[in-house]
């Protein structure tokens, strides 16, 4: 699944199959998050609404890795103390607090981000979402067609932390947020043929030695990641992830995967491409992420 369950006492996490969806019910700041947990955790299932009254952009909640978006909590809690349910959205990010290879796209038709469910201090759950972000029924998931390949660029955001084995083999001892640039190549029939996720940056608080304080986002020691498509349905491509070479921990292809879907409107078919992914690394980490990208016309 594209979610992680984390235990506070053992500082370990496991992949979970949690069905999650986000309905965007207005032009801005209007969401309904619906989660369906496995049977053993069914008490945590349900729907949570978010409005502008739930904005929680303080203390770094709206920054994942180096990308800054919007964050919401219900109920709105001081300092992010449980219990709460939280949501982030990066369809219209402010900025990338690092050396960005390209500007963060301002997405018109799709939203993407993370969700978090914190019932108490003993355990917590994080997952990812993507979906129509135009607040209108005119968005379609049709594949674009063209005479040549198309390139999409954007960013991945997500959560990463120690896996179920953890211990000394894990690079991290707790769940952290990350972001990374992503570039995807689509063929003339509108199918993903390749993709690359570059340097993963981890949010590590603020540098208060300067004024105003700046975000600290060191690189995670993980090699760049490739998308390897293996199948498709009418409107969704899927596949595995693998390491692209270079220095850093590698990704286990057998337990990693992605899905991607186009978003657009009549006259602008397939202008945006979004999806979700998960991966496991050789340095004891598991991660879930979502991404949003936009078509980049050839120069």
PLM regions with names:
Residues 1-299:
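Mature soluble binding/inhibitory domains
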């Amino acid at each position: 699944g594209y979610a992680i369950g984390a235990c506070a006492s053992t500082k370990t996490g496991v992949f979970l199959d949690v069905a999650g969806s986000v309905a965007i019910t207005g032009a801005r700041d209007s969401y309904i998050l619906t989660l369906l947990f496995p049977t053993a955790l069914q008490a945590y299932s349900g729907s949570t609404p978010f409005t502008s009254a739930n904005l929680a952009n303080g203390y770094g909640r709206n920054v994942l890795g180096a990308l800054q978006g919007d964050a919401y909590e219900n109920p709105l809690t001081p300092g992010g103390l449980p219990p709460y349910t939280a949501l982030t959205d990066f369809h219209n990010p402010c900025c990338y607090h690092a050396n960005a290879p390209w500007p963060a796209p301002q997405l018109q038709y799709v939203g993407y981000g993370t969700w978090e469910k914190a019932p108490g201090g003993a355990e917590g759950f994080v997952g990812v979402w993507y979906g129509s972000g135009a607040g209108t029924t005119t968005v379609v998931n049709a594949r674009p067609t063209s005479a040549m390949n198309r390139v999409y660029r954007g960013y991945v955001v997500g959560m990463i932390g120690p896996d179920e084995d953890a211990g000394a083999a894990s690079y991290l001892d707790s769940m952290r947020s990350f972001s990374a640039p992503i570039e995807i190549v689509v063929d003339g029939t509108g199918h993903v043929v390749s993709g690359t996720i570059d340097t993963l940056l981890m949010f590590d608080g603020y540098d208060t030695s300067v004024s105003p304080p700046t975000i600290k986002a060191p690189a995670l020691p993980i090699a760049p990641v490739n998308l390897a498509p293996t199948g498709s349905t009418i409107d969704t491509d899927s596949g595995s992830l693998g390491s692209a070479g270079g220095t850093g921990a590698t990704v286990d292809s057998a337990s990693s995967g992605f899905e991607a879907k186009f978003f657009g409107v009549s006259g602008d078919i397939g202008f945006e491409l979004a999806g979700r992914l998960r991966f496991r690394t050789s340095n004891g980490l598991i991660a879930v992420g979502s991404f949003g990208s936009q078509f980049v016309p050839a120069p």
